[in-house]
Amino acid sequence: MRISQFEGKAVALWGWGREGRGAYRALRAQLPTQSLTMFCNAEEVRELESLADAALHVETDASAQALGRFEIVVKSPGISPYRAEALAAAAQGTQFIGGTALWFAEHAQPDGSVPGAICVTGTKGKSTTTALLAHLLRVAGHRTALVGNIGQPLLEVLAPQPPPAYWAIELSSYQTGDVGRSGARPELAVVLNLFPEHLDWHGDEARYVRDKLSLVTEGRPRIVLLNAADPLLASLQLPDSEVLWFNHPEGWHLRGDVVYRGEQAIFDSADVPLPGVHNRRNLCAVLAALEALGLDAEALAPAALSFRPLPNRLQVLGSVDGISYVNDSISTTPYASLAALACFAQRRVALLVGGHDRGLDWHDFARHMAQQAPLEIVTMAANGPRIHALLAPLADAGRFGLHAANDLEHAMQLARDALGGQGGVVLLSPGAPSFGAYSDYVARGRHFAQLAGFDPAAISAIPGLGVH
């Protein structure tokens, strides 16, 4: 559905975050006088009233009855369509649509294709992979948009001039279903990996997997690039797409630090500013994507050396009094924390874990700690006590030191004390969202930097967003 089809209909927007702001501006650009209703939080009402938009009505009660008054509701990604009020309104005939679906519908050719649209998703590594893809496309001389979940909503760049040759689009599991629902087909979709996440939004693991994979099962991209080492992905059957693989001995893969294409050694990635084996494997995904687009991936590979790492993703802030501080605030699953730990396997590490509790299972994390653990673990925040109880038997057996903190500031003090003035690494890789204590993972990362003695404002910008 295109925005022009909203004309004359009862339309509301739900959510006044960055995605909601982008949706409002996109609708107003095409429908300047149409009546719209915005459902927002009470503290956002004043900001909306300051827009002085006489055709905009503001409400704070997004009940099933209120939502059911509208033919179309443009929903922000963070609002789950599985909420009771959304399901009830949908049963009454209300159509819910996301900004991602609108963008794809606006860009679709008559045959449904969206040339140059490259969608990247996965539980871990999708932001860095998308940014690296955009970086190498630009090095190759192509005007490229770096957009989506990475921090630039698609509807904020609906019709840039001149248009980019490629769109490097990061999609979260909140957005992947929008692509299929739009009726459009991306040129290429990359799926990096799948681990349980966002279960509070999706409801259960099976639905998370289904929603995540709807990008390729319902979106029917022209080309799909999958991680051959991920069992869930390896079993997919996608008859409507050309399926390619990375992390496979016959394609682009990693041996030690060396990137191979089949049996041919291409590039030593040891000096690429991508901490962790998982990130260098995702470099293989980027090179495979470039090749799938018809570009010379082998020639472009060395340009990865000039890539600027993203903030809050295994970001080394620096050292104070012999202790290095690493900000991995983006880590919102136990698997992400394990990947972060693997980057510092030979170091004295104090790991800070815990955050908003959305019911993820930490037993695999505990099993890994029984085999290879950091020197110290500090638990904190809402799910900290649950993690602490799970790890306590291992700590009692002498596998590592275990400490319980009230908040991040307390956790950092406990970590510094536990390292005992002998140097080491304080690693913030919470394995959980920041909700409750912070507005988002960026705010958590900034607070960590501030508490460590660094300028929080200097580490927060994602380079290269938008069209360049």
From Swiss-Prot:
Keyword Plastid annotated: no
E.C. code: 6.3.2.53
Any Pfam family matching the protein: Mur_ligase_M
Keywords: ATP-binding, Cell cycle, Cell division, Cell shape, Cell wall biogenesis/degradation, Cytoplasm, Ligase, Nucleotide-binding, Peptidoglycan synthesis
Disulphide bridges: none
Pathway as given in its UniProt record: Cell wall biogenesis; peptidoglycan biosynthesis
Catalytic activity field: UDP-N-acetyl-alpha-D-muramoyl-L-alanine + L-glutamate + ATP = UDP-N-acetyl-alpha-D-muramoyl-L-alanyl-L-glutamate + ADP + phosphate + H(+)
Record: residues binding ATP: G122, T123, K124, G125, K126, S127, T128
Role noted for this protein: Cell wall formation. Catalyzes the addition of L-glutamate to the nucleotide precursor UDP-N-acetylmuramoyl-L-alanine. Has weak activity with D-glutamate.
The protein, known as: UDP-N-acetylmuramoyl-L-alanine--L-glutamate ligase
Protein's organism: Xanthomonas oryzae pv. oryzae (strain MAFF 311018)
Organism lineage: Bacteria, Pseudomonadati, Pseudomonadota, Gammaproteobacteria, Lysobacterales
Encoding gene, per UniProt annotation: murD2
